[in-house]
Amino acid sequence: MSFHDLHHQGVPFVLPNAWDVPSALAYLAEGFTAIGTTSFGVSSSGGHPDGHRATRGANIALAAALAPLQCYVSVDIEDGYSDEPDAIADYVAQLSTAGINIEDSSAEKLIDPALAAAKIVAIKQRNPEVFVNARVDTYWLRQHADTTSTIQRALRYVDAGADGVFVPLANDPDELAELTRNIPCPVNTLPVPGLTIADLGELGVARVSTGSVPYSAGLYAAAHAARAVSDGEQLPRSVPYAELQARLVDYENRTSTT
C-alpha cells in the first residue's frame, strides 16, 4: 500500500509525528507504517519557537536520518521557509520523502492564498510523486475561522495540485462534516477532544495527525518523573533501557550498511 493509498482506506489512518530518531523508532515498535514530523517538536528541541523558519536545516538532517526506516515519512516544512515557490520546490526535492506538510501562514498570519497555491504548483511540478498536504490555518490562527473561507482556500490548493488538506483545530463535528463534503481530497485533522477515530471517520476525515501531542506529553512525563524521584514516589512506567538500546543498535547497524 502506497502512502497515497493510506489516505483512501475508508477509515482514518493515524500519522504519529516524530521529532528525532528515538521517537520514530518508538512509533515503529508500536506498528505504525507511516511517520510524520512535528515542526513544533523539531524547533522546540532545538531551542526555537515554532513557525520562525528556524528548522530548515534540521528537517533535512531529520529526513535523512529517518530515510533508512521501513516506513513512509512525511515532513512538516512550516511555510516552506521561503516566499519563493521554486526555492521551496528545490528544498522538497532535497528531503526525498513520501510526503510533506506546507501551511498557508507565516509569522502567525495567513498569507495570500495565491502565493500558497503557487508554492504547491511548484512543489508538484518538481516533485510529482510527493504527497502534498496543504495546511489551511484559518482555524489554527482563528483568522477567517469559518467553513466558507476554509473551503475557498482549500479548493485553490486542490486546484494547484494538493493531494490532501489539513485543517488543524477544526473541531466542531458539523463544521468538519461540511469541510469533508466540500473538499474533494483527503482531509486531515488533529485529534479532536471527545471524538474517536471512528467518529472522525464517520465525519469523512481520512487522516489524523498526532501533531505535537506526543512531544508535549514526553516533556510532561519527564518533568513528573524527575519530581517523583525528588519526592520519593513510585516511578512512572517507561521503556526499559535495554529495549531502547537495542533499537538504537539495530538502527545504527542498518544505517551503517546504507
Swiss-Prot record:
Domain of life: Bacteria
Xref: SUPFAM superfamilies: Phosphoenolpyruvate/pyruvate domain
CDD domains to which the protein is assigned, alphabetical: ICL_PEPM
GO MF term list: catalytic activity
Induction trigger: A member of the dormancy regulon. Induced in response to reduced oxygen tension (hypoxia) and low levels of nitric oxide (NO).
InterPro entries linked to this entry: ICL/PEPM (IPR039556), Pyrv/PenolPyrv_kinase-like_dom (IPR015813), Pyrv_kinase-like_dom_sf (IPR040442)
Pfam families: PEP_mutase
Protein name stated in the entry: Uncharacterized protein MT2054
Native species: Mycobacterium tuberculosis (strain CDC 1551 / Oshkosh)
